[in-house]
Structures are given as C-alpha cells and as structure tokens.
Amino acid sequence: LLKMYSIVEVGSFSYPKPTKEVNEDFLLLPTYDLESNIIFAIADGVGSSSSANKASECAINAISRTLRTKKFSVESALNDAKTAIDELTSLDEKYSDSATTLTIVQIQEKNVVIGHIGDCRAYVKKQNKLLQLTKDHTRYQELLDEGELSVRKLHQHRERLSSILTKALTKSYKLDFDIVNIPIENLIEDGVLAMSLMSDGAYNHWQKRAKFSATTMN
C-alpha cells in the first residue's frame, strides 16, 4: 500500500530514575501497520521493579504482534495488551502484581487516534509549544476535574496525588481506557506533524515551561 505519510525524524531516550534499579519504560518507535498508518506507543511499568519492567515490555510486545498479524485498531491493541498482561500474571507468581500504563498513537489519513491508560502523555508541538492531548489518570487530575478544592490547595499535594494512578493495565481491574480522536488538520503545522510521547520522568521537566527555543535541546 502507498504510505500516506512519511516518518521524517524519530528520537527517543529512556533511563531509570536514581531510586530505580531497572528502567520501567518501554517504547514502540514509529512504524507502519498493515494499512500504512503510523503507530507508536509508550508503556511505563507500575509497582515492584521486576513486575513493572516485565509488564511494560509485555504490553509493547503485544502491540508489536498485533501490528504484524491483523488489521490494527487502537482498541484491539489495548485489548491484546490486556490479554498479554493477564497471561503474564497467570504464568508466574512473581508477576502477580504486574501493571503498566500504556499510551498508543495511530496516525491515519485524516485523524490521529490515541488510546490511553495511566499517566504517560501524548503531546503535539505547535507554535514552539507542547500541547497535551491526553488527560492523566491520577488522583490529582481526578480532584482537579471535580473542582471541589482550589488549584492552589491541590498544587501543595501535587507530587503525592500525581503518583496515585486511577487507571492502569493490570489483571486486577477491568480494562478501562480513553480514546482521543483528533482531525489531523488540527495538529499539522507547516506540513509537519510533530508528536511526542512521554512518561512522568520526562514531562515533569516540560510542564514547568512547555515551550521550545533554539537552545532547548542543547
């Protein structure tokens, strides 16, 4: 099939936090599904080091298999990742508490579809700013949406409340995810769609000043 869009440039980085022995992030770098849509994803493991690392790897591997074997949809990929996590949990007791966040992007001809569970984020770069396209599944965001506490009051406890996930990919809970569907024309700038996926370790830096300059990445 003729590819509708070309992948011009890809960059990625990931490293464990100082308090972690292993890296709990896994990435699916941009690639094409069987219908020439562009797919990429990020997963950030939750919980103990061994199960967190394995859970995020398992979720990304499940998406990779889905890409190669059948018509891809974000919903089917999320369901396949959930099945893979459930199987991992059943196979080995040491992975019984396996859980991960998962954010998947599918760039179609006319739309960008994002499937989202947890607190990783999808951004688009427009006018030298990063615009957040997903909403965190955290206690902080939940309280913010409820509007019963002031933003100032919530901000005092932001770090603690942001670490409490309200949704994750795990056998312990029913699959529950957000689907974001955005016309691609709303995201493209000067003929380019510039998107980023980030786990909390990365976006905690950007949210302080989500703007690019000529020296941002120096």
What spans do the regions from the language model cover?
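PP2C/PPM-type serine/threonine phosphatase catalytic domain
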Residues: L1-N218
